[in-house]
Regions:
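Amphipathic alpha-helical segments of the small helical/lid subdomains adjacent to P-loop NTPase cores
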Residues: 1-25, 46, 114-115
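Exposed alpha-helical structural elements
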Residues: 2-3, 12, 43, 93, ...
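Active-site-adjacent structural elements in folded domains
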Residues: 6-11, 60-64, 112, 129, ...
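Structural motif
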Residues: 8-18, 35, 63-72, 136, ...
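Solvent-exposed aromatic/hydrophobic patches embedded in short alpha-helical segments
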Residues: 17-22, 26, 47, 140, ...
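Hydrophobic repeat-domain scaffold segments
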Residues: 20, 144-237
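Amphipathic alpha-helical segments within well-ordered protein domains
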Residues: 27, 78, 99, 172-176, ...
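Extended helical regulatory/linker subdomains that flank P-loop NTPase cores
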Residues: 31-37, 41, 45-146, 151-154
Length: 237
């Protein structure tokens, strides 16, 4: 009952509860933390931390890798899958992506092959199909880990193409929530489609940081679109 009351008081999280898997994981975070963060980006981080480390630690299970170290390998895997527009990937391809990251956290080559099944068995964050293909338990986790990877590594991103592509929109929202979203919003304004401007409007609410001049330019654009002949633009504004 306490959890339901907390969710009702956090509109940014209540929409997530329609998915049974996400609701279960939200309940797990609430159980181990005693409270819920107020932002989606913080909730996803907490879920990953609980699943990849704290849950096992609470049960007294020894783990050779910390949650942070596991993410070092999982984040580039998620990013590569997003860039390939994949929801599942073969074990050989996955290990090729994660080989160097796993070495960087001192996982020996002969031990690396057990990483995927270990993550599945210990956290459920990854799932293996009957055909031996691997996928993240929910697209949300693939998107979140991709956004975290981009945010942490600061690599040049293809905003100009992605802002008008719905496949990338949730990744970009989550990226904005933990980064300076100025370049992203500028790309949305330059594209000037309803889809791109809708993404930019979301960034107004979720961005960790956004330059004042770009924020004002977007607000002025949305105000101007109130008089647009396009009903979709008027609705967005």
């Amino acid at each position: 009952q306490d959890l339901l009351e907390r969710l009702r008081g956090l509109p940014a999280l209540s929409d997530l509860t329609v998915n049974p898997l996400l609701l279960t994981m939200i309940a797990m975070v609430h159980r181990y933390r005693g409270q819920l963060p107020g932002r989606r980006i913080e909730l996803y981080a907490e879920i990953c931390d609980v699943l990849l480390g704290h849950w096992r630690k609470a049960k007294g299970i020894q783990d050779s890798l910390t949650a942070v170290q596991k993410r070092v390998a999982l984040q580039p895997l998620a990013a590569a899958m997003m860039q390939g527009r994949l929801r599942q990937i073969g074990a050989t391809a996955a290990m090729a992506i994660m080989a160097e990251p796993l070495q960087s956290v001192n996982v020996k080559e002969e031990d690396a092959t057990s990483f995927l099944p270990d993550v599945q068995a210990s956290s459920g964050l990854l799932q293996e199909s009957e055909l031996g293909e691997w996928r993240f338990a929910h697209l949300t986790f693939q998107e979140y880990l991709t956004a975290a990877h981009f945010s942490e590594h600061g690599e040049e991103l293809n905003f100009a193409e992605w802002v008008d592509d719905s496949w990338w929109h949730e990744v970009l929202r989550l990226y904005a929530a933990q980064s300076n979203a100025t370049t992203l919003v500028r790309a949305c304004l330059a594209k000037d489609t309803v889809s791109a401007l809708s993404l930019a409007a979301d960034c107004l609410d979720e961005a960790r940081q956004l330059d004042v001049d770009v924020r004002q330019a977007l607000e002025q654009k949305l105000i101007a679109d109130l008089e647009s002949d396009d009903p979709a633009r008027r609705t967005l504004a």
